[in-house]
Amino acid sequence: MFRTPAEKHSVLIFHGLGPPQRKLEPGEAPFWLGRDPFCALLDRIARMGADAPQITFDDGNASDIEIALPELAARGLSAAFFLLVGRLDHPGSLSQADVKALAEAGQTIGLHGHAHRDWRRLDPEGRQQEFREARRRLADLSGQPITLAAAPFGLYDRQVTKTLIAEGFEALYTSDWGRASGRRFLRPRNCIDATMDDRALSAALDGHVRLTRQPRRLLGLARKRLLPGGPAA
């Protein structure tokens, strides 16, 4: 099962694999990775032993079950799959039966919400749907307790963090880059995309934040973690 070690470790985010089977959202295309590059990267991860990064998938694309699961199994790897309940059974996305199949294969199911919305802008009704109802549905389908969440678009603030803690989640996985610790609620991840060269991939595998990215990252962290934020209504 998926568990972030107490010592700091890199955590990777993958999205879609292979040719998309649904209409993509604006700006989503670069985050789709071909099967061959994905398999080559898994081979590198499998050779890293105790230093290997953790693996996560966002959005619940059909490629999670068609490509990711068999390739992970072939290498003895596991991952966390952060799923969108509102996309289940839609073309190009996982089915309800696929959620159970992932769980039965030893993979961890996490919450990505219901409709891929900005969690900072939720009103009480939205929080009910995105957090509680979606979580219950995933628990019913997977047979697992849903204790991990990943913020859509990597967007969160102090209010989102407080709400998830109050709801009993163990961790919020972000898109902030860097290394994650199992001792902390907020856990940064390193996003893999099709434009990355070998140097960028190596930095992601290690969780190293490049110097050119550090000022923007620090500013983003300050905004997300220090500003109060809150719902739109």
Regions found by a protein language model. Name each.
Residues 9-24, 28, 51-54, 73-160, ...:
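Metal-dependent polysaccharide deacetylase catalytic core of the NodB/CE4 family, i.e.
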Residues 66-67, 120, 197:
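Short, function-defining helix-loop hinge/capping sites that tune catalysis or transport
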Residues 3, 70-75:
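Short, charge-rich binding segments
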Residues 33-37, 60, 91-94, 126-133, ...:
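Soluble or luminal CAZymes and related metallo-dependent hydrolases
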Residues 59-67:
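Short acidic, Gly/Ser-rich segments with clustered Asp/Glu that frequently serve as metal-coordination loops
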Residues 37-44, 67, 71, 133, ...:
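Amphipathic alpha-helical segments that form well-ordered structural scaffolds
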